[in-house]
Amino acid sequence: LFPISEFLKHITWDSLQDVDAHRQIIYDAIVSYRRMKNQGVVAVFHRDRFDRFSNFARIGEGSLGGKGRGLAFLDHIIKQHPELNAFDNADVMIPKTVVLCTDIFDEFMDTNELYQIALSDIPDEEILRAFLQARLPERLIGDLEAYLDVVRQPIAIRSSSLLEDAHYQPFAGIYSTYMIPYVESRDVRLKMLRDAIK
C-alpha cells in the first residue's frame, strides 16, 4: 500500500470540497494499484479471491499451453515497458485471461475415456456428441461458477493443439473460437461455458 500512499500524499485535500471527489480519487488510486500489481503475473485461480481486477489466472497445475504462455509473455513485456501505454486512447494490453491447464484436460479425457473416441475414425459429429455428453472435472465447476459471478460480458473460449507449438509447422488456428454472449442467467451461461470448453 505504500505506492498508493505515495501517490495520495501529493494531493491537496483542502482544495477538494466534495467528499465524493475524495472517495473517487482514493478509489481510482486503489484500482490503478491493483491493475499494476496484477499485470505480468500468472496468478493461481482462487474462487474466493478472483475479482474484476484479476488479469491472468490459471486453473490447474499443468502446462499453460502455447496460447497461454504467449499471452503471459506479452503481459510481462507490457509491464516491463510502460512507454507502450504513453499514448492517449491507445491502451496496449492482453485480454483478461483464465487458462485451464493441461492437467484439467487430461483428467477430462481420462475420466470420460475419450482418448479412444478422439483417436478413432468415427465421424466428427459422433466425436462431438461424445465430448458434449462427457462430464467436466467436478473440481472445475465451482471455479467456473466463481468466474461467471465476476465476468459480466461476452467470453471467448480458445483451444490449443500441441502441434500449434511445433517449430516450422504452421498448424495454428485449426480449432474454433467459441463466443458466449452475456445473459443474465448464470445457469445458462454456465451451460454454454461448459459446452464450449468441451
Predicted regions located by residue number:
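Nucleotide/phosphate-binding sheet-loop regions of phosphoryl- and nucleotidyl-transfer enzymes
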Residues: 1-198
